[in-house]
């Protein structure tokens, strides 16, 4: 299949495996959930009654004082421990390499089918100015106001990185930094010709 290059009459032949396969919602959902869970720090921690600093002396005598109580570190008291206290743990989920690559291909194919995938010859700016970068995006006419844009380039220069980081709803990444969450969460994805070739080398 061929993809039309924005701002040109030329087309770019691409692999059907990457940009023309059937969309698998279940697979994409599984990979996205696993990716987001793996990104969790899992550092939540609470203290149980045995870990709270405090005396273990019986708070009052056993008889004649109403309900019977022991140490003030029990969960029932203010300042006491937490019942079933949470401990740091890993939320990471294993995803097979073949599954991950298939999900990325499925996302690219669906973006292409919906008309949300655009290809440009190259994307770079000569100066580190946000205004220049914004004008370049506007000249492409690929995204509306308020829409999120993901630009994937084979090489990211310092000028491109600096001029793009202050724009809301715009994310510039290299092929190596691609992930399923960024692809799914973007309204429009713009690929350079060089990025398309690297993506095909990675996924085919």
Curated annotation (Swiss-Prot):
Alphabetical keyword list: Ribonucleoprotein, Ribosomal protein, RNA-binding, rRNA-binding
Residues covered by region (Disordered): 42-70
InterPro entries, A to Z: Ribosomal_uL4 (IPR002136), Ribosomal_uL4-like (IPR013005), Ribosomal_uL4_dom_sf (IPR023574)
GO molecular function, one term: rRNA binding
Top-level taxonomic group: Bacteria
Cysteine disulfide partners in this protein: none
Record GO biological process: translation
UniProt KW RNA-binding keyword: yes
Compositional bias ranges of the Polar residues kind: 42-52
GO cellular component, one term: ribosome
UniProt-listed PANTHER family: 50S RIBOSOMAL PROTEIN L4, LARGE RIBOSOMAL SUBUNIT PROTEIN UL4M
Role noted for this protein: One of the primary rRNA binding proteins, this protein initially binds near the 5'-end of the 23S rRNA. It is important during the early stages of 50S assembly. It makes multiple contacts with different domains of the 23S rRNA in the assembled 50S subunit and ribosome.
Family: Belongs to the universal ribosomal protein uL4 family.
Complex and partners: Part of the 50S ribosomal subunit.
HAMAP family: Ribosomal_uL4_B
Protein name: Large ribosomal subunit protein uL4
């Amino acid at each position: 299949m061929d993809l039309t290059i924005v701002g040109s009459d030329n087309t770019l032949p691409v692999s059907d495996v990457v940009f023309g396969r059937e969309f698998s919602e279940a697979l994409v959902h599984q990979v996205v959930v696993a990716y987001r869970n793996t990104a969790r720090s899992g550092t939540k921690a609470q203290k149980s009654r045995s870990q709270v600093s405090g005396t273990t002396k019986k708070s009052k005598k056993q008889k004649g004082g109403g309900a019977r109580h022991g140490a003030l570190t029990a969960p029932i008291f203010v300042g006491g421990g937490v019942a079933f206290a949470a401990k740091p743990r890993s939320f990471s989920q294993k995803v097979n390499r073949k599954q991950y690559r298939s999900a990325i291909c499925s996302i690219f194919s669906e973006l292409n089918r919906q008309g949300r995938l655009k290809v440009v010859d190259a994307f770079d700016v000569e100066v580190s100015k946000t205004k220049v970068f914004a004008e370049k995006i506007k000249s492409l006419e690929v995204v509306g106001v308020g829409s999120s844009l993901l630009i994937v380039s084979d090489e990211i220069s310092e000028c491109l990185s600096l001029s793009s980081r202050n724009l809301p709803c715009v994310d510039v990444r290299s092929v190596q930094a691609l992930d399923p969450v960024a692809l799914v969460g973007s309204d429009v994805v713009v690929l350079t010709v060089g990025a398309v070739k690297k993506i095909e080398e990675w996924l085919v």
